[in-house]
């Protein structure tokens, strides 16, 4: 089943992206480099739960 997740910026800006992930195929937490418009750089985004 695909679940909604939140990707939170590691730069500490509070910026986040939302996406879906298949928990069966990727049970570990995702870490992706994406663009953070607050600091205007590509930074690591880590998976967090949507509350």
Curated annotation (Swiss-Prot):
InterPro entries: Ribosomal_bL33 (IPR001705), Ribosomal_bL33_CS (IPR018264), Ribosomal_bL33_sf (IPR038584), Ribosomal_zn-bd (IPR011332). Keywords: Ribonucleoprotein, Ribosomal protein. Belongs to the bacterial ribosomal protein bL33 family. The gene is rpmG. PANTHER family: 54S RIBOSOMAL PROTEIN L39, MITOCHONDRIAL, LARGE RIBOSOMAL SUBUNIT PROTEIN BL33M. Pfam families: Ribosomal_L33. The lineage of its organism: Bacteria, Pseudomonadati, Pseudomonadota, Gammaproteobacteria, Pseudomonadales. This is Large ribosomal subunit protein bL33. Gene3D superfamilies: Ribosomal protein L33. GO terms for molecular function: structural constituent of ribosome. PROSITE patterns: RIBOSOMAL_L33. One of its GO terms (cellular component) is cytosolic large ribosomal subunit. NCBIfam families: PRK00595.1, rpmG_bact. GO terms for biological process: translation.
């Amino acid at each position: 089943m695909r679940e909604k997740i939140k990707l939170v910026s590691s730069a500490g800006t509070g910026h986040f992206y939302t996406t879906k992930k298949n928990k069966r195929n990727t049970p570990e937490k995702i870490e992706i480099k994406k663009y953070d418009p607050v600091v205007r750089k590509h930074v690591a985004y880590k998976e967090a739960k949507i509350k």
